[in-house]
Amino acid sequence: MYSIAISTISNRIETLDLTPYDDIQYVIVHQETHQASPDAVKALSARPDVIYVPLDKKGLSVSRNTALANATGDYVLIMDDDVTFSIDAIHALHDHFKEDDIDVATYYHKFTNGKTTLKKQSAYNHHLLNIANPSSIDICIKNESLLKSNIQFDESFGLGAQYPSGEEMIFLADCLKFGLKVKRYPLEICTHPPVTSGADFFTTKQKILAKAAMFNRIYSKFGRLLFILFVLKKTPKVCQAGYGKFFILNAISSLIERK
């Protein structure tokens, strides 16, 4: 059994398209429930393949953790309310879990405009220096390993939190630090609209601070150095977007503030 952990908010729950499958359980965590149609909520709650969890707390990571706590499937896939998935790709992923005896798998996703995040055609093991690329919707966890490790998303990071990004990279880092086996596979599990929040890490001071805090959270005493290298690498791209000076000044400010 696979648990599809979906975070949704407000009336977005009304647009969910949840195809029934014999081996799929949907765990829907719903924030700002008062803005949704009661009929839509009632219809979903009545389905035997749906676990509906209303949540009155804020934050995407809080929602993710609530979904993980309520999932009862053997494997839990993190997803959003604007994502669709391939059941055949999930079955292929299950084979990899069995063959490689892994605890956490990451993969890739397509976009509705036909583009893809799939860049590498071979599988590889994750370590602390190659976990930056997977999005939350590219993560599947063996539930047994999750319960054993008690790892959660850091609720200080993610949309609606103090730091609005970085939660998925921190989650993978915590898995690795615990000793879980984490591997990436050349599978496209999900399809997502082409606009993603992770692509914008530079248009506000808080987004830049979040990157600095993330590097510090994961790499401790090496975090400052790795953040500086990140800034140097990304500056040309940010300059093309017209935020070069803003990005650099706030990156420097974040380093000073975190002394």
Predicted regions and their residues:
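Catalytic beta-strand/loop signature of glycosyltransferases that borders the donor
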Residues: F153-E155, G179-T191, T203-T204
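Acidic donor-binding loop at a coil-to-helix junction in glycosyltransferase catalytic cores
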Residues: G158-I170
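Short aromatic/hydrophobic "clamp" motif used to bind/position activated sugar donors
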Residues: V76
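Glycine-rich, basic loop-to-helix element that forms the pyrophosphate-binding segment
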Residues: L55-A71
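Acidic donor-binding segment of Leloir-type glycosyltransferases
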Residues: I13-P54
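The conserved acidic donor/metal-binding loop of glycosyltransferases
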Residues: D80-T84
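Non-catalytic, C-terminal membrane-associated alpha-helical segments of glycosyltransferases
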Residues: F202-K259
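Conserved donor NDP-sugar-binding/catalytic core segment of glycosyltransferases
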Residues: D88-K119
